[in-house]
Amino acid sequence: MKSLRLLAVGKLKTPFWQQAAAHYLERLRHTWRVTETLVRDGDAALPPAKRNADEGARLLAALGPADIVVCMDERGKAYTSREFAALLDRLTENATAVPCFVIGGAYGLDDAVLKRATLRVCLGPMTFPHEMARVVLLEQLYRADCILRRSPYHH
């Protein structure tokens, strides 16, 4: 069974995002070892740059030296679902390195985290709330798994 990590800022607070994330995590865990690591949100009273830096420091501390860091970033490369599946397949060829998909908080990812990235991926040209972005990423990971297994989920 291949492994992947999801590293994100904060817990999902909205019940329907919690349910959607749990749904895709459950499906993914049938064929993948998925580790979800959440770091604490930055203090909302702080200016956005300071909040981002604090969250970034926590994200960096949670990364392992062998992690293949894939940052979800609006300036990243956009992939079709099939291209993303092929990328996931390539990222998991080496059993000693684990792809770690990183999602920032309300203000995205700090530059220090982006500098640690092996790869930056864009979910699309539109901006999503970070809770929605997490669910979209989980769905796309599940879809990629189905594409790789030739499951009928993706038409």
Curated annotation (Swiss-Prot):
It catalyses: pseudouridine(1915) in 23S rRNA + S-adenosyl-L-methionine = N(3)-methylpseudouridine(1915) in 23S rRNA + S-adenosyl-L-homocysteine + H(+). InterPro entries: Alpha/beta_knot_MTases, RlmH-like, tRNA_m1G_MTases_N. GO terms for cellular component: cytoplasm. It is found in: Cytoplasm. S-adenosyl-L-methionine binds at G104, L123, G124, P125, M126, T127, F128. Its EC number is 2.1.1.177. Its main location: cytoplasm. Keywords: Cytoplasm, Methyltransferase, rRNA processing, S-adenosyl-L-methionine, Transferase. GO terms for molecular function: rRNA (pseudouridine-N3-)-methyltransferase activity. The keyword ATP-binding does not apply. It is an enzyme of class 2 (transferase). SUPFAM superfamilies: alpha/beta knot (SSF75217). The keyword Transmembrane helix does not apply. Signal peptide: none annotated. It comes from the Bacteria. Specifically methylates the pseudouridine at position 1915 (m3Psi1915) in 23S rRNA. Belongs to the RNA methyltransferase RlmH family. Homodimer. This is Ribosomal RNA large subunit methyltransferase H. It comes from Nitratidesulfovibrio vulgaris (strain DSM 19637 / Miyazaki F).
